[in-house]
Swiss-Prot record:
Classification of source organism: Bacteria, Pseudomonadati, Pseudomonadota, Betaproteobacteria, Nitrosomonadales
Organism: Nitrosomonas eutropha (strain DSM 101675 / C91 / Nm57)
Keywords assigned: Ribonucleoprotein, Ribosomal protein
Name listed for the protein in its UniProt record: Large ribosomal subunit protein bL17
Subunit (UniProt): Part of the 50S ribosomal subunit. Contacts protein L32.
Molecular function in Gene Ontology: structural constituent of ribosome
Gene3D superfamilies to which the protein is assigned, alphabetical: Ribosomal protein L17
GO cellular component, one term: cytosolic large ribosomal subunit
Length: 130
């Protein structure tokens, strides 16, 4: 029985899924806004939000856990120096997922994923909605 197995497999092997979500997470943390397909965006929320929650408690163990999930030192530093303090008073729900039409070519539903309360320095949304 498949009770409570809600993971989207996205037609990928487990190692491919892990690498894909690690890359999406690092891109989202670096740019604070990305454009991807809607199923990937919904599954990305399950990966990113616990990592940001780790940043609210800056212990050595949580830094090691964050590095284990991301494998990117710059993003780990950003989580604990910027994002943790930014979301200190927010209990989850750090992402906004906006539907933005369908992709030309395969008609896949697309979405924009962004961090809430993102800084004005990261408003480099030039052609994100095309």
């Amino acid at each position: 029985m498949r009770h409570r197995n809600g993971l989207r497999k996205l037609n990928r092997t487990s190692s491919h899924r892990l690498a894909m979500f690690r890359n999406l997470t690092n891109s989202l943390l670096e740019h604070e806004i990305i454009k991807t397909t809607l199923p990937k965006a919904k599954e990305l929320r399950r990966v990113v939000e616990p990592v940001i929650t780790l940043g609210k408690n800056p212990t050595l163990a949580s830094k090691r856990l964050a590095f284990d999930r991301l494998r990117n030192r710059e993003n780990v530093v950003k989580i604990f120096s910027e994002l943790g303090p930014r979301y200190q008073n927010r209990n989850g729900g750090y992402l906004r997922i906006l539907k933005c039409g369908f992709r030309k070519g395969d008609n896949a539903p697309m979405a924009i994923v962004e961090l809430l309360d993102r800084s004005e320095a990261n408003n480099d949304i030039v052609n994100i909605a095309e």
